[in-house]
Swiss-Prot record:
UniProt-listed Enzyme Commission number(s): 2.7.1.48
Chain's gene name: udk
NCBIfam families: PRK05480.1 (NF004018), udk (TIGR00235)
Keyword Kinase: yes
Keyword terms of this UniProt record: ATP-binding, Cytoplasm, Kinase, Nucleotide-binding, Transferase
A Pfam family the protein falls into: PRK
Protein name: Uridine kinase
Catalyzed reactions per annotation: uridine + ATP = UMP + ADP + H(+); cytidine + ATP = CMP + ADP + H(+)
InterPro entries listed in its UniProt record: P-loop_NTPase, PRK/URK, Uridine_kinase, Uridine_kinase-like
Known pathway: Pyrimidine metabolism; CTP biosynthesis via salvage pathway; CTP from cytidine: step 1/3; Pyrimidine metabolism; UMP biosynthesis via salvage pathway; UMP from uridine: step 1/1
GO BP term, pick one: CTP salvage
One Gene Ontology term of the molecular function aspect: ATP binding
C-alpha cells in the first residue's frame, strides 16, 4: 500500500471474470463523479493492457490463455500508474475482444485525484500492489460468474456458447484457482455478492470520499 500523499490515488478492484468488478467500478465512478466532477475521478480497466498480438495470426491469438498473468503487459501498466502519480498524462491502450489484439489508436488519460483500476489479475503482481492506495476483491461464487460470463460474451462479444464454455473449463476456472483466488489475501476489503452489494458500495464511497477532502 502506498503513501496517501501521492497526487493520484490508485484504488484496485480485483476478482474473478464476471464477478462484478466493472459494475462496482462504474457505480463508484458514476456516483462519485456527481459529487466531485469528472476531472477528479477516472476508471482504467486492466483489460486495456492485454499484450499486443498483432504479429500473430488469428488462429494463434485465440489460443492465448487470457487468464494467465503472462497475457498482461503489467510492465506498461506499472509505468502508466507511476506516470499518473507524477502528474503526467498517459496514452491508454485500446484492446479489441473481436480482433484479440491491441488496436493502433490510444486514449489520452489525464491525471485524476482518484483512479479506479479494475481487473482480474491486479493483485497477482507485487509491483502493482505496491502502487495501490487500497485494494478490493470482489468475491462472487464461480457458478454465478459463469452465468454472467456466458451472457456477456455471447451477447456483447459475439462468441458462441460452446467457445465460452470451452475456455471456461480449459483456462478461466483453473487460472482463477491458481492465481486469482490466492491473490484475495492481499486485498484490504473483500466484497461478497458482487456489484449489487449496496452496503459495500456505500462503504467504499465513504472511504474514497476521504481522498477528496
Amino acid at each position: 500500500m502506498t503513501d496517501q500523499s501521492h497526487q493520484c490515488v490508485i484504488i484496485g478492484i480485483a476478482g474473478a471474470s464476471a464477478s462484478g468488478k466493472s459494475l462496482i467500478a462504474s457505480t463508484l465512478y458514476r456516483e462519485l463523479r456527481e459529487q466531485v466532477g469528472d476531472e477528479h475521478i477516472g476508471v482504467i480497466p486492466e483489460d486495456c493492457y492485454y499484450k499486443d498480438q498483432s504479429h500473430l495470426s488469428m488462429e494463434e491469438r485465440v489460443k492465448t490463455n487470457y487468464d494467465h498473468p503472462s497475457a498482461m503487459d503489467h510492465s506498461l501498466l506499472l509505468e502508466h500508474l507511476q506516470a499518473l502519480k507524477r502528474g503526467s498524462a498517459i496514452d491508454l491502450p485500446v484492446y479489441s475482444y473481436v480482433e484479440h489484439t491491441r488496436m493502433k489508436e490510444t486514449v489520452k488519460v489525464e491525471p485524476k485525484k482518484v483512479i479506479i483500476l479494475e481487473g482480474i489479475l491486479l493483485l497477482t503482481d507485487a509491483r502493482l500492489r505496491d502502487e495501490l492506495n487500497f485494494s478490493i476483491f470482489v468475491d462472487t461464487p464461480l457458478d454465478i460468474c459463469l452465468m454472467r460470463r456466458i451472457k456477456r460474451d455471447v451477447n456483447e462479444r459475439g462468441r458462441s456458447m460452446d467457445s465460452v464454455m470451452a475456455q471456461y473449463q480449459k483456462t478461466v476456472r483453473p487460472m482463477f484457482l491458481q492465481f486469482i483466488e490466492p491473490s484475495k489475501q492481499y486485498a484490504d476489503i473483500i466484497v461478497p455478492r458482487g456489484g449489487k452489494n449496496r452496503i459495500a458500495i456505500d462503504i467504499l464511497k465513504a472511504k474514497i470520499s476521504q481522498f477528496f477532502e
